[in-house]
Amino acid sequence: MKAVLCKQFGPPELLVVEELPSPKAGAGEVIVSVKAASLNFPDVLIIQNKYQFKPPLPFSPGSEMSGLVKEVGEGVKGYKPGDRVIAFTTYGAFAEEVKVEATRLVPMPEGMDYNSAAAFLLTYGTSDHALRDRGQLRAGETLLVLGAAGGVGLAAIEIGKAMGARVIACASSADKLEVCKQHGADAGINYATEDMREKIKELTDGKGVDVVYDPVGGPYTEPALRSTAWRGRLLVVGFAAGEIPKIPLNLTLLKGCSIVGVFWGDFTRREPKAFASSIAQLGAWFREGKLKPHVSQTFPLEQAVEALKLMAARKVKGKVVLTTTA
């Protein structure tokens, strides 16, 4: 089988595609024949040795995929060869066959194609955990989404609207904001050309926002936190800007606000019942037509370098997906 390999840490150009032996399922494991695998910003970080998980070389990047169950290991219940599934892992998805723990599988929702399925679980799962669980977003509140045109950003917009919130999207260009509005955003802020804090004051009549969804970090976190309303919640989702911001803690005192961490990967392991409930809710919203994964581009597995270069340059709207002929 073919796999994208990181043999030395660095930019996407250092990745190679090689033939490897097919994996074998051990106890509690499943082999998935991959149809599609989507890119996420951690894939850019992990190949540079800048992610919190640091796998030994060589390894395949990629954390979510869709496909067919090829083989099940001893003790696996609920899955059989031929089942259509979504799978998630810390790394390893950019390959034609992937070995995963059975607990890392979710049945594909009816009516969902492989490309959309590969773009669904991590982005919508993260955003649902962030907004419903960690942020306690309520109907009628105002949600500010940073990096709103990315995969998790668009998912946050759709989930925020499904929950009855008013959503303000922040992105770096007019065309990105147009995509955000197509996915339900009520208003947009172009932080490349507009003063974010002043625009938030204007859009909220000076009240501020109730919840900030922040997968970006860098220079945007502090002004977003300063723009929260009383008892506001800032959700720390990631650091796509590359810089981990340093926040003056007196802001939390003055505003009675909270800074809340969101780590979906550990949540799925530590709280399996809550994770199952989240998946059930996401499936229901998908069937109701409220969630529509935005796959902007597809590449064959062999062109993973080109796809990751787009992700690293922050030129992606929604999700980019790698496809296989498996």
Walk through the language-model features, giving the residues of each:
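Residues located in well-ordered beta-strands
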Residues: K2, V16, P21, S33, ...
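Glycine-rich beta-strand-centered segment in the early N-terminal region that forms part
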Residues: P21-S38, K50-G92
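NAD(P)H dinucleotide-binding glycine-rich loop of Rossmann-like/cofactor-binding domains
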Residues: S33, L45, G78, R84-G147, ...
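Short glycine-centered segments of the SAM/dcSAM-binding site in methyltransferase folds
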Residues: R84, T142, R166, R233, ...
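Short, glycine/polar-rich helix-capping loops at beta-to-alpha or helix-loop-helix junctions
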Residues: A93-E96, A171-V179, I244-L249
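Mid-domain Rossmann-like dinucleotide-binding core that forms the NAD(H)/NADP(H) cofactor-binding site
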Residues: A118-E194
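Short amphipathic alpha-helix with an adjacent loop that forms part of the alpha/beta core around
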Residues: M196-G206
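Glycine-rich phosphate-binding loop and adjacent beta-alpha segment
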Residues: P219-L291, V316, T323-A326
